[in-house]
């Protein structure tokens, strides 16, 4: 009898020890995962928080109130928390790409000749920009509100400015602190200007291009957006052509003329002049040549964007291809294609090897 009781006590003690060991191992495993994937875990937490806030705030506002700002991207407006289901949910592509970038961060902070291969601010900002686009566009199409539209535009400006300033930081050997200062100062000023312009219908110049006025909102949503894309093209043309001026001027001019949709003539002219000036400045002050492998990732990324740009045109309200009641929405395809392009651009940036000094 005594032996049986003793065995039972011993058995219970062993079970308790095993249970404690399992708890300790689980805690240690989570601790290790959090340490190695801190940025990924934090991002998941923030996304869950944003989703919760979206549901709580939306239940008493845009879900029950008339729409405030129609996006005019074909899809019919639905009742409830998500006004444009397909145009909204397709933005999860950007979020997924950002999370993939964060998951792929190294588990240690070892230095590399390529910052995009490090656990550093540069891939984290790239991922943040991708997630920001997804969240911002989700807010615009999901809520049909003015603040949602502002989130959409600021997200796009945040991301598209990153390659430009990142390339400059690599070409001219900026410190991390200088890069962050320039990047965030310009972005904050841009976001404030865009938000103010979106809520105040300010006309800067009447009849600027024919009968079309130049509005304050055009500075960020037309000129600055296009300028960032053009400068990025100039930078990549510079690196891939070995600083040949004809490519540095020709590529952004062709893109500006062929990919612009409904832009005023004066806007096209001014952008082309700015592209020529910037190409000349970078040509005669080249800094380091960035050695990256364009094939296949850069070309696939640009291909996805160009096809997406064409598809985007069919996704506007009033187009012959527009079917508001269909589950297939061209604008949703635009989101998926451009989300894919971000992933391939990320892969392209990871191919950089040691920069070389350029000599004229």
Walk through the language-model features, giving the residues of each.
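Short Cys/His-rich Zn2+-coordinating modules
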Residues: 286
């Amino acid at each position: 009898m005594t032996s049986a009781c003793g065995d039972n006590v011993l058995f219970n003690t062993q079970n308790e020890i095993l249970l404690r060991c399992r708890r300790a191992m689980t805690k240690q495993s989570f601790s290790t995962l959090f340490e190695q994937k801190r940025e990924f875990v934090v991002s998941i937490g923030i996304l869950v928080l944003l989703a919760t806030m979206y549901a709580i705030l939306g239940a008493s506002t845009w879900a029950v109130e008339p729409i405030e700002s129609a996006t005019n991207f074909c899809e019919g407006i639905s009742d409830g928390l998500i006004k444009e289901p397909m145009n909204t949910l397709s933005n999860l592509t950007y979020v997924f790409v950002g999370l993939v970038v964060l998951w792929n961060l190294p588990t240690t902070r070892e230095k590399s000749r390529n910052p995009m291969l490090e656990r550093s601010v540069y891939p984290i900002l790239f991922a943040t920009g991708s997630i920001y686009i997804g969240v911002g566009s989700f807010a615009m199409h999901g809520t049909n509100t003015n603040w949602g539209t502002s989130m959409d535009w600021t997200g796009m400006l945040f991301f598209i400015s990153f390659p430009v300033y990142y390339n400059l930081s690599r070409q001219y050997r900026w410190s991390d602190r200088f890069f962050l200062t320039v990047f965030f100062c310009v972005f904050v000023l841009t976001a404030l200007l865009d938000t103010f312009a979106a809520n105040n219908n300010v006309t800067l110049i009447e009849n600027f291009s024919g009968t079309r006025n130049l509005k304050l909102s055009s500075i960020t949503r037309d000129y600055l957006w296009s300028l960032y894309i053009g400068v990025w093209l100039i930078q990549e043309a510079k690196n891939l052509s070995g600083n040949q001026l004809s490519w540095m001027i020709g590529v952004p001019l062709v893109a500006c003329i062929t990919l612009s949709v409904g832009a005023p003539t004066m806007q096209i002219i001014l952008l082309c002049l700015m592209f020529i000036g910037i190409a000349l400045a970078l040509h005669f002050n080249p800094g380091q040549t960035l050695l990256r492998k364009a094939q296949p990732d850069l070309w696939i990324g640009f291909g996805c964007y160009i096809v997406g740009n064409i598809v985007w045109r069919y996704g506007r309200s009033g187009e012959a291809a527009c079917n508001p009641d269909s589950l297939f929405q061209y604008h949703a395809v635009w989101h998926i294609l451009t989300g894919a392009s971000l992933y391939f651009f990320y892969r392209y940036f990871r191919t950089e090897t040691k920069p070389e000094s350029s000599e004229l």
